[in-house]
């Protein structure tokens, strides 16, 4: 009898999930909550829900930060040390007491990336003043006093994924905020590593001219679907769960050959599971959807010909608002310079065969309650399978998936 192959443990190797926003700060009465008392415990916290107006193209993008302490004491701050050359030593992780978070004797030994960095003030010489904090609580308190509505800023942070009522949600957690430089244009960019399988490329949405791309995002959970992922406390932090998240890839309908090659090169997976890191943009509520000349109805084109509108005026009048939609649009694969000092080469961050399909079929993904015996739950949507195998469709777009 053949020995059952062990599953490969999921891990975040060469994994990135970060964002950058450049635009105007939108500060309202509800942006900050200061020294709020939790209803469930003795926890005191500060919370920031900040919108950044990244312009008509991207809209107002939300990001957040929250942190606090226990009234009864015992709050610890996790940090890491420095190496002799001053670089971060991630292998040297430890905690300091809450009351020591401003103690210079401790701060001088802590690695740079343990700090949140804020630079939204200038000195008398017009130089940016950088303030560093160990806790989100102190960051939010400082921003509450100093961040002003309309201030042009650059925000960097990490993407965090969670599950609420069976829906995957994304949070943009702030790491740093600086004044944007004069030459920096609006930006709403993210970089996200994901896992792709043969079902990831779905049937194109021909109204929006996009391919839905479903990737798996790895996030660590202590409990998932009623299952204890710490194995009774033996596994600190829990285990990684592959969360299904839908992205979009825009295509040019006028160049079918280019679209076909682009999908084949980057997204198509023939076997096993591929890991890829993509750069993309957020488009959220308030973004303006720009109309092109080809999109204009004939009656409006006639008004242009008769001189009632210029082409520019007509395009502006026909632009529509994106409403409450929240989109993550994939643009291009990430390129990273790898190798030693004498042999550095650019490398597309795409790794085929990272896992087998079976590696993602984990027992703890199934809800703990007994499933209905009359209904078998598949690891993918039945519609997805039909799309992948539907190669006889008349449309060239449909032939790509």
Model-inferred region functions:
Residues 1-401:
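OB-fold and OB-like single-stranded nucleic-acid-recognition modules
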């Amino acid at each position: 009898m053949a020995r059952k192959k062990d599953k490969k443990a999921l891990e975040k190797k060469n994994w990135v999930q970060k964002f950058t926003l450049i635009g105007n700060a939108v500060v309202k009465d509800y942006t900050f909550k200061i020294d709020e008392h939790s209803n469930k415990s003795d926890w005191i916290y500060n919370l920031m829900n900040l919108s950044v107006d990244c312009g008509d193209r991207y809209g107002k993008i939300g990001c957040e930060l929250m942190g606090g302490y226990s009234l009864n004491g015992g709050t610890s701050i996790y940090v890491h040390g420095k190496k002799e050359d001053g670089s971060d030593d991630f292998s040297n992780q430890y905690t300091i007491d809450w009351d020591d978070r401003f103690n210079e004797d401790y701060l001088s030994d802590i690695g740079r990336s343990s700090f949140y960095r804020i630079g939204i003030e200038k000195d008398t010489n017009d130089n940016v003043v950088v303030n560093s904090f160990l806790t989100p609580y102190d960051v939010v308190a400082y921003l509450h006093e100093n961040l002003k509505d309309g201030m042009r800023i650059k925000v960097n942070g990490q993407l965090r994924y969670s599950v609420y009522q069976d829906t995957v949600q994304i949070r943009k957690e702030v790491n740093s905020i600086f004044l944007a430089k004069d030459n920096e244009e609006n930006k709403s960019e993210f970089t996200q590593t994901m896992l792709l399988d043969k079902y990831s490329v779905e049937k194109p949405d021909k109204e929006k001219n996009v391919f839905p791309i479903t990737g798996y995002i790895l996030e660590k959970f202590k409990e998932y679907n009623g299952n204890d992922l710490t194995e009774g406390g033996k596994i600190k932090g829990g285990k990684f769960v592959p969360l299904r998240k839908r992205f979009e890839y825009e295509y040019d309908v006028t160049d079918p050959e280019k679209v076909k090659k682009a999908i084949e090169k980057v997204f198509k997976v023939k076997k096993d599971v591929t890991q890829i890191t993509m750069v993309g943009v957020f488009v959220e509520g308030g973004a303006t959807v720009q109309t092109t000349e080809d999109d204009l109805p004939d009656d409006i084109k006639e008004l242009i010909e008769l001189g009632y509108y210029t082409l520019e005026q007509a395009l502006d009048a026909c632009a529509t608002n994106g409403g409450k939609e929240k989109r993550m649009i994939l643009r291009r694969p990430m390129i990273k310079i790898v190798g030693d000092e004498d042999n550095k080469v650019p490398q597309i961050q795409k790794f085929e065969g990272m896992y087998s399909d079976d590696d993602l079929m984990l027992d703890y993904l199934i809800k703990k309650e007994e499933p209905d015996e009359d209904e078998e739950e598949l690891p993918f949507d039945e519609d997805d399978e039909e799309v992948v195998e539907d190669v006889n469709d008349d449309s060239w777009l449909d032939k790509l998936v």
